[in-house]
Amino acid sequence: NITIEHSIIQNDILLNRRIEEYLSSRCGFYEIYTYPWIDEKYIHAAKIDISKSLKLATPPAPSLAYLRSSLIPGMLEAIAKNLRYYNEFKLFEKAEVYQKGDYRPSSNDEILPVQSNYLTGCIVGKNAKEIFYEAKGVIENMARYCHMENIKLEKIEKPNYADINAYLNVTKDDKIIGSLGLLSVQVMSDSKIKRTNVAIFEINSDK
């Protein structure tokens, strides 16, 4: 006999739809889509150790040789581009990231990078305190609206991109699964993000 069960994948699809609806319809975010290969300068700008990123054998361009291990670099690039036209905006992206690992889905001869689903979002505006607390509220309310398992916001470990005085970690079952913070002055400078403030968050949605 074959038993058909409602799979975890179906639940994931429903959760993703809830998150999209919540961020776009209720919070005023616009969804963006970026390529999996990232401009090297934004990897450095995000203060990510590039040695932990996967390098492509045949990149589409010399500066696009690395696969993203985080969605933050792509979001930095999107912010810099959008600031040419807008002073205030909110963006989000849901996508896979690729990390070095030893993932063998079907045979020992086939070694693939470890792939994880991440969610990132940003609020860009002049008032740093206001956008930080708005982003904090977005995450807190997302858990309730999307029927997600309880997540908490705690100050444990500063993310590399964040200002030393304005960050929080997203935790679940006492484990860090994401972060929220204002971009540091150095990260904004290296990303050519000028005359504004940015609150940004990133969550591993597989955890």
What is each residue range found by the language model?
Residues 1-207:
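Extended beta-strand-rich architecture
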